[in-house]
Regions:
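A compositional/biophysical signature of low hydrophobicity enriched in polar/charged and small residues
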Residues: 1-88
């Protein structure tokens, strides 16, 4: 099960961003972490056994990071393309 968590931090200053990065690094469920330009501050790709396991991760870990102001989850309905090929 894969979910994407859009995360808003309490502030966008360097200290807050670095604190989030440091606290999210040890979380094995968070397989990707991207600092974003746009609506949210961070986008995480989370891999869990199922939706229940993801919800437990969100409750136990993600929303307990003190600099997380808000987190919203996106779940894809169907993967229609995945490639690593680049035409150069």
């Amino acid at each position: 099960f894969t979910a994407y968590a859009r995360v808003w931090l309490t502030s966008q200053d360097l200290e807050t961003v670095e604190r989030f990065i440091q606290e999210s690094q040890p979380l094995p469920e968070a397989v990707e972490c991207h600092l974003m330009a746009g609506e949210c501050d961070v986008m995480l790709r989370i891999v869990a056994a199922d939706l229940t396991a993801y919800r437990q991760f969100q409750i136990d870990h993600l929303t307990r990071i003190d600099c997380v102001h808000n987190a919203k989850t996106e779940v894809h309905m169907e993967q229609v393309k995945l490639t690593s090929e680049l035409s150069v």
